[in-house]
Amino acid sequence: MARRPDLKTGPARLAALVRTSVPPMHPAGLPFVGASLAVALAGRKSRWLRNAGVASAAANAAFFRHPPRTPPTRPGVVVAPADGLICLIEEAVPPSELRLPATPLPRISIFLSLLDAHVQRAPLGGEVIAVEHRPGLFGSADLAAASADNERNSIVIRSPEGAEVIAVQIAGLLARRIVCDVEPGDTVGLGDTYGLIRYGSRLDTYLPAGSDILVDVGQRTLAGETVLAELPR
């Protein structure tokens, strides 16, 4: 009779520990990790090249990590679309390319450093009704001017109850690629992954007027988990 693997001490246990300890990686990171490992393999006879390739692979795997998150279950909330630091809370007109009324709305800006996970998650569950990309500059994403001047990609999500929330991916000083995996007509759940920005960036979230903001400037957020606000009733 064949023996069952020992899940407490055997290789299966080690594999389980690795799976629970090391977060998965977003598919967008595979080319970067693969290229770094290829450099390490090609330069395996050179200690410098080998170490540089392995270090680059590890850094890219960490940058593109895609940690699991558990969204809140209570209704009527907006969650953070990104990990990072809240750098601004103010009222501002939504991006002009969305062709929405020029009425200022509450806006929460989250700055992502190189050390943060850079996947973006839906701040609201519902239907994606608009996606608009606008070319721009690549200034420092923590500056107030970044919302207006930098390259950006905006999505509008409408909940089944009719509330609309805007999430804007903004490229930063090092960011050169905004990835958005949703299109108008798609349905997203609260906290679902919808995109990524490579190497330093910012996320602006525009809320419906009358929303009750529950966070402060300087507070850190976890994408898909931190509640930014309660929608007006």
Curated annotation (Swiss-Prot):
It is found in: Cell membrane. One of its GO terms (molecular function) is phosphatidylserine decarboxylase activity. The record marks 200-201 as: Cleavage (non-hydrolytic). The modification Pyruvic acid (Ser) is found at residue 201. Is synthesized initially as an inactive proenzyme. Formation of the active enzyme involves a self-maturation process in which the active site pyruvoyl group is generated from an internal serine residue via an autocatalytic post-translational modification. Two non-identical subunits are generated from the proenzyme in this reaction, and the pyruvate is formed at the N-terminus of the alpha chain, which is derived from the carboxyl end of the proenzyme. InterPro entries: PS_Dcarbxylase, PSD-A. Binds 1 pyruvoyl group covalently per subunit. Disulfide bonds: none annotated. GO terms for cellular component: plasma membrane. The active site is at 201 (schiff-base intermediate with substrate). Its cofactor is pyruvate. It holds the Pfam family PS_Dcarbxylase. It catalyses: a 1,2-diacyl-sn-glycero-3-phospho-L-serine + H(+) = a 1,2-diacyl-sn-glycero-3-phosphoethanolamine + CO2. Its EC number is 4.1.1.65. Catalyzes the formation of phosphatidylethanolamine (PtdEtn) from phosphatidylserine (PtdSer). Belongs to the phosphatidylserine decarboxylase family. PSD-A subfamily. PANTHER family: ARCHAETIDYLSERINE DECARBOXYLASE PROENZYME-RELATED. This is Phosphatidylserine decarboxylase proenzyme. It comes from Mycolicibacterium vanbaalenii (strain DSM 7251 / JCM 13017 / BCRC 16820 / KCTC 9966 / NRRL B-24157 / PYR-1) (Mycobacterium vanbaalenii).
